[in-house]
Design a protein with these regions (language model features):
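A generic local structural motif
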Residues: 2-5, 29-31, 49-51, 101
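Short, acidic/turn-prone active-site loops that include or flank metal/cofactor-
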Residues: 68-70
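Generic structural signal for secondary-structure transition and capping sites
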Residues: 14-15, 61, 100, 121
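Short beta-strand segments
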Residues: 13-48, 54-56, 62-66, 75-76
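Alpha-helix boundary recognition
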Residues: 10-11, 57-58, 96
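Short secondary-structure boundary/capping segments
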Residues: 7-8, 34, 54, 104-106, ...
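Charged, gly/pro-rich active-site loop segments
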Residues: 1, 72-140
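Short, basic/aromatic recognition patches
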Residues: 1-15
Length: 140
């Protein structure tokens, strides 16, 4: 699957499961609303009181699963950053284009935004015979 088709697949899905690692090494997962950049970055919001927030600040490596309808999924591993300044504004614009109803969340106490840059992506479609399983090359 090329990057354009992968982007189109990911954009069709509004939710993903993000997994992070706690301070004691325990994996923790949460369903989050997502937006996807053309560079295949995943943007999501959370609050600083969530478990994922301190996990990602201390250990930015994380993973996502996006999609699952019809056994089509993207497995995604990457590095999370909390953007600020002009970068934050740019990513918020992308996020709110996907989630306009979340724009009022900017006023929530402790709201935070993360951008996860991919380091490894695999697309799988188990509805096909034989299944389609493709890894996508990520350039550094």
């Amino acid at each position: 699957m090329d990057r354009i088709a992968l982007h189109a697949f990911m954009v069709r899905h509004r939710f993903g499961v993000v997994s992070s690692i706690s301070g004691d090494g325990t994996p923790q997962s949460a369903l989050v609303g997502i937006a996807i950049t053309p560079q295949l970055e995943i943007i999501f919001d959370t609050v600083r009181s969530s478990r994922k927030y301190p996990n990602l600040i201390a250990r930015p490596v994380c993973s996502f699963v996006v999609g699952w309808t019809g056994e089509q999924t993207v497995q995604f591993e990457g590095y999370a950053t909390e953007p600020n300044g002009p970068d934050l504004k740019r990513y918020q614009e992308i996020y709110f284009a996907a989630w306009p109803e979340c724009e009022p969340h900017m006023n929530w106490p402790g709201i935070a935004y993360f951008v996860v840059r991919p380091r490894w992506i695999r697309y799988s479609d188990y509805d096909q015979k034989p299944p389609i399983i493709e890894e996508v090359a990520i350039s550094s």
